[in-house]
């Protein structure tokens, strides 16, 4: 994406900022960013300027041969308050009457997966993130069903022509029409 954009817009400086969806959305709203790729969850309504890039189910990541899954309260690795994946996991467990304990906090999914690999916790993450994780992580279907998560492209309220061009490159890479 960036290579194609750079070839067509060689004089444009691109600064990449990584962070959680809440922080990026706030930075976009405050005019600190021109464009953001954000995750949502639980079927939350999208903003008018959001463009859906990808939708996939959340799933439970567990240690393949671990004991953590059998323990109660169920030990969780989650992101901070406000993360839609965290909210989906806690709501599903609460609705199913499964007691839980937040054991590990990290806004980085790889850190959550490290807790799962060590059989210290389970985590609710996008299906593709679990499927692509190294062993001994697998997907568990004994825990309550989780909702879908979306990855969306959001631009500033009044995007520049360069921002529109980058957005078009991103949408094209995800096979989404402009």
Pin down the residues of each PLM region.
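Beta-alpha-beta core module
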Residues: 45-51, 117-158
């Amino acid at each position: 994406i960036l290579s194609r954009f750079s070839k067509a817009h060689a004089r444009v400086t691109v600064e990449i900022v990584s962070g959680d969806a809440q922080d990026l959305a706030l930075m976009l709203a405050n005019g600190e960013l021109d464009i953001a790729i954000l995750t949502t969850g639980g079927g939350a309504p999208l903003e008018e300027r959001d463009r859906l890039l990808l939708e996939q189910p959340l799933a439970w990541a567990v240690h393949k041969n671990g004991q953590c899954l059998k323990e109660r309260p169920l030990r969780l690795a989650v992101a901070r308050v406000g993360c839609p994946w965290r909210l989906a996991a806690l709501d599903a467990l609460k609705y199913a009457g499964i007691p839980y304990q937040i054991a590990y906090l990290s806004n980085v999914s790889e850190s959550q997966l490290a807790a799962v690999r060590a059989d210290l916790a389970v985590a609710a993450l996008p299906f593709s993130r679990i499927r692509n994780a190294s062993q001994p992580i697998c997907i568990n279907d004994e825990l309550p069903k989780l909702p879908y998560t979306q990855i969306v492209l959001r631009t500033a309220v009044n995007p520049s022509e360069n921002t529109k061009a980058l957005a078009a490159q991103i949408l094209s890479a995800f096979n989404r029409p402009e």
